[in-house]
Regions:
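Conserved beta-strand elements of the Class I
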Residues: 9, 171-173, 334
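Active-site donor-binding loop signature of nucleotide-sugar glycosyltransferases
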Residues: 39, 82, 117, 127, ...
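A fold-wide structural signal in alpha/beta-hydrolase
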Residues: 171, 195-205, 367
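Acidic helix/loop microenvironments that form the catalytic cleft of cell-wall polysaccharide enzymes
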Residues: 177-179, 257-258
Length: 407
């Protein structure tokens, strides 16, 4: 965090898997002299910063940010009220009593605020304008559903107000579930075309992420990886059971580790989905560690070289090795990759798409989209992003029977 009053202020997960704020005298900084300033809370402590003579602590609770003002002795003074479930970025320093922060959510394009430490009031000082879209017509709610082993899993659902739960609404279910990465609320312009065509956007906070600290992460890695797929399946079943949708209207999507998620989930429950979009996915779990940076993922996946037991576990869900070939009807699938992806090499998607097309999995289309002169995704020019999502939504709309010209 920083140094003040002759002390180092820092966050540690030692003895607190969701994090706690500590101090130690610079002159005597051994671990035996650490002093707990703010103990572990229900939320995950994701950041702390000085703001004048006070401190701003940001927690992630149930996958959404909460922000509090503390004094330097560890006493909570105030909560910075946010518009709804969202994600916050903090800018503050020791020499200024005014704090600046950004806020975004599923139906909130990024907005900037100033917060006065003296009055406890926020003032919006900037926003992102999106023309021809009324965000007030849409709402986000958070639900908690039960996974296969009884674990409660949070999920955000965004939809148009007044939507009827008749089991016929198109749902776009997104997940990741790995590498200690959380999925907080975020804004993406590409989702607007989905929402304005009557779609529901659902984002499940699966195990393997950091939403509830290291225990949540550990619950979705190595020989717990099936928990992630079961969490995703349970999210789909929840949306169906609660009459948000039905299998004929349900699309799933995920990228990278999320592409693995989609590929594995489709093999486990092909009956649950109408469309699947596995993007730049890790599809060969037996050999992933032999390509480029793949060896670095062993901390989450384990490798087939670790042990016979680990190899058998990986083989049990590896997407390319578990495609059914008995006439089981699979959803329409568009695999995406890029010819210069050196993170998840395109061979994963090539092998998976070839295996899909060779197998007897019904008549729904099984396509692969190969982007040229592109990589894993980061830094992609906007023109390529637009082209990719145009193809993705066209594929989804075609297979769900949605005509975007008729709203």
């Amino acid at each position: 965090v920083g140094v003040a009053d002759g002390k180092l202020f820092f966050i540690t997960t030692k003895g607190a898997q969701r994090g706690r704020l500590m101090t130690v005298e610079l002159a005597n900084a051994g671990t035996d002299n650490w002093v707990e300033l703010v103990p572990e809370q229900e939320g995950v402590l994701s950041s702390a910063s000085f703001a004048g003579d006070k401190m701003i602590l940001k927690y992630q609770k149930d996958a959404a940010d909460q922000v509090y003002v503390y004094d330097r002795s560890g006493k909570k003074l105030n909560e910075i009220k946010l518009p709804t479930f969202g994600t916050v970025g903090i800018s503050s320093d020791k020499d200024n009593n005014e704090v600046y922060y950004s806020f975004t959510s599923f139906t909130y394009p990024s907005a900037r605020y100033s917060y006065d430490m003296a009055t406890g009031e926020s003032k919006q000082i900037g926003s992102t304008e999106i023309k021809n879209f009324n965000f007030d017509d849409y709402v986000t709610e958070q639900v908690f559903y039960t996974s296969k082993d009884g674990t409660k899993v949070p999920m955000f659902i965004t939809y148009k107000k007044g939507l009827e739960r008749n089991g016929k609404n198109p749902v776009y279910l997104y997940g990741y579930g790995g590498f200690n990465v959380s999925l907080p609320p975020s804004f993406s312009p590409n989702r607007l075309v989905w929402l304005e065509n009557g779609g529901i956007y659902a984002q499940a906070n699966l195990r393997g992420g950091s939403e509830y600290g290291e225990e949540w992460h550990q619950g979705g890695i190595k020989q717990n990886k099936l928990n992630v797929f079961n969490d995703f399946i349970a999210a789909a079943e929840y949306m169906i059971d609660q009459k948000w949708t039905s299998p004929d209207y349900l699309t799933i999507e995920g990228g990278s580790n999320g592409g693995l998620l989609v590929g594995a989930t489709v093999n486990l429950r092909p009956d649950l989905f109408k469309v699947a979009i596995p993007r730049v996915g890790v599809m060969d779990m037996m050999r992933y560690h032999k390509f480029t940076i793949g060896w670095n993922w062993a901390s989450d996946y384990g490798t087939s070289a670790d042990s016979k037991e680990m190899a058998e576990y990986l083989l049990s869900y590896s997407p390319v090795h578990n495609i059914k070939n008995d006439g089981t009807k699979y959803p329409a699938i568009m695999v995406t990759t890029a010819d210069h992806d050196d993170r998840v090499v395109p061979a994963h998607s090539f092998k998976y798409a070839a295996a899909l097309q060779a197998a007897n999995t019904g008549n729904a289309p099984k396509l692969i989209r190969i982007d040229s002169k592109a990589g894993h995704g980061a830094g992609k020019p906007m023109s390529k992003v637009i082209d990719e999502y145009t193809d993705i939504y066209s594929f989804i709309f075609q297979n769900l029977g949605i005509d975007p010209t008729k709203k």
